[in-house]
Regions:
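Generic structural "secondary-structure junction" signal
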Residues: 15, 19, 26-28, 44-46, ...
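Secondary-structure boundary elements
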Residues: 98-180, 188, 260-262, 277, ...
């Protein structure tokens, strides 16, 4: 699938900010065998006093910006054309949890893609006894079957509610509520798998939404999204699952970044020199591109 993606993040401040410094993670990367970025651009208004681009430890695209002059708003616009072609899942040859731990012990690398980075508790996805007990009900004959079942159960057992949680909500709190959004469901799945000894990480990106039959597609109605990557052994490697929708990641999922939890891939983090609050808005368009045949 070929997509044109447009993202607009806007923050309006109650009082003018005298300065600020931020890190922005919204630019999709090229990922071998998954997606290819054909073109991309990122702009800011007002223009920052300083700007630099780099890759973080996990290989995510980061733009660092700083402002020295007073400003009462920040407007961020990203556009990209991305081709997505995820491989079809093959025959499940992943080991069971016991053998997975043996394979994990044999991994000596601490490179960014090493499963060891995704096994311990993290800020948003701590190891929690209640979540581990819930996840144990999905433990199957293989790592993949365990992940599939847990993904489907979270989709079935939890209610999507955009008012129930915030970006600061931890997996244990969302689990108690039995409601939340994609970030919460991903953190719950990550915490549950880690509790079973299965490495799992957080993926941020975009998801194309399809309007109801007969309804027009609305501008800005698509969304930034979150899902889960799971290490399923030496031969199977990393697989991705979307517990919000009870499915594997598909060609409608466009990756922006990945990490241990939301805090590693938040779209924007930083500090402001100001005395008031702020209001943020987000608009996303994920538009399929149909190329005319020659």
């Amino acid at each position: 699938m070929l997509y044109d993606i447009r993202l607009n993040l806007r923050y309006d401040y109650d009082a003018a900010a005298g300065g600020g410094r931020h890190q922005v993670r919204v630019m999709p990367p090229t990922i071998s065998g998954v997606q290819r970025v054909i073109a991309a651009s990122l702009s800011f208004a007002p223009a920052p006093s300083e700007r630099s681009d780099f890759s973080d430890f996990f290989g995510n695209n980061v733009t660092s910006i700083a402002f020295r002059d007073a400003h009462d708003a920040l407007d961020i616009r990203m556009s990209a054309r991305v081709a997505v072609s995820r491989p079809e899942p093959g025959l499940d040859v992943s080991p069971d949890i016991r053998r997975l731990r043996e394979e994990l012990d044999a991994v000596r690398s601490l490179s960014p893609g090493s499963p060891h980075h995704f096994l311990a508790a993290s800020d948003h996805a701590g190891i929690d006894a209640a979540i581990t007990a819930y996840a144990r009900g999905s433990a199957g004959s293989s790592a993949v079957s365990t992940a599939v079942d847990l993904c489907n159960r979270i989709h079935r057992d939890f209610t999507y509610d955009g008012e129930a949680t915030t970006v600061q909500t931890r997996a244990s709190d969302a689990f108690d509520l039995r409601r939340g959004v994609c970030q919460d469901f991903s953190h719950i799945m990550i915490a549950g798998l880690r509790g079973l000894g299965i490495p799992a990480g957080y993926v941020s990106g975009f998801l194309r939404t399809i309007p109801p039959r007969g309804k027009p597609r609305l501008e800005g109605a698509d969304a930034m999204h979150a899902w889960v990557k799971v290490w399923c052994g030496r031969d199977t490697g990393w697989q991705e699952f979307d517990p919000t929708n009870g499915m594997r990641a598909s060609n409608d999922h466009i990756t922006v970044g990945h990490g241990r939890d939301y805090s590693d891939v938040a779209p924007i983090v930083g500090v402001l020199k100001t005395t008031g609050g702020q209001v943020g808005e987000q608009a996303v368009d994920v538009i399929p591109v149909v190329l005319e045949k020659a």
